[in-house]
């Protein structure tokens, strides 16, 4: 456990997942940050996957990362069917599909610049997540485009628009 200057404790991954495991309806999304060294990314992924397996949480976990290297490592090392999304926005749907990625999890600006990517992802059988969509007109646009997941800081407005 890491103790902050203000006295708060930062839990380890295992400690956090043990608490989260009790929330049985909660889908767990883990973002792996980009490292300067690919070897560290691989070792981190191995640790993450071992911890998730130990706690029997594989079916509830999804992984997201800005690192293309980490996406490929998660796909290589995780059990088949594990959801892995790429965040960086610089890879088209066909390449994501070819790599075995579940789909893109791209910033709103990426999909606004490439609106055809949403339909293409769906044609390829992938899921689409977009972030961070806070304006009602943008929410409506992504609802109409049938984005599978919309990340927002204003969920009440999004829920109202989805009715």
Protein language model regions, located:
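Metal-dependent phosphodiesterase/phospholipase catalytic core, i.e.
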Residues: 1-82, 102, 124
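C-terminal active-site rim and adjoining tail of enzyme catalytic domains
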Residues: 5-8, 85-163
